[in-house]
Amino acid sequence: DDVFRAGRNGSESFPAILESHTPLDLIIIMLGTNDCKTVYGATAGIIGKGVETLLEQVKKYSPDSDILLISPIYLGENVYKEGFDVEFSKESIQVSKNLEAVYEKIALKNNIHFLRAQDFVSCSETDQEHLDAQAHKIFADAVYKKTDEILKARFIKAAC
């Protein structure tokens, strides 16, 4: 839970969102960067447990959906420094890098699709944590290709 901003725990509203949008062919989950903030003191493993909670909710409320888990980009090396985002620390950078291995294991364990954002883009130099406009376009293209692949396979399987 975000101690500074109420209503930021997505797992509380996620079941209602899933139920109200069923049936869903594909659910995409990409989160974890904000969980790297110093205030939470979370490791990549702890953040991964949160992802697993969401996956359990998907399996309960939308069991026929395909799932794509995306590991987020790494935080920039200067993100914690003055002029950037002091809610992060030097340790936060390593936690953000560790997320991809944790998420990949979760994807394999749960037999779901996986994509690494860092394979396509990295954070902007401007703020050391978000994508710039060009990176958004590149990443959107990568996600489109992956979702197209998943949905084509899904529809071929359904037609058989």
Regions found by a protein language model. Give the residues of each.
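Carbohydrate-associated surface elements
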Residues: 73
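Histidine-centered active-site loop/cap adjacent to the catalytic His
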Residues: 113, 127-160
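Alpha-helical structural signal in soluble globular domains
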Residues: 53, 57, 61, 102-110, ...
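Conserved SGNH/GDSL esterase-like catalytic core that processes O-acyl groups on lipids
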Residues: 1-63, 94-98, 130
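Short acidic/His/Gly/Ser-rich catalytic and metal-binding motifs that mark active-site loops
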Residues: 37-38, 76-81, 122-125
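Structural beta-sheet core signal
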Residues: 29, 68-70
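Substrate-gating cap/lid alpha-helix
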Residues: 76-116
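Conserved beta-strand termini and adjacent loop/short-helix elements that scaffold enzyme active sites
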Residues: 70, 117-120
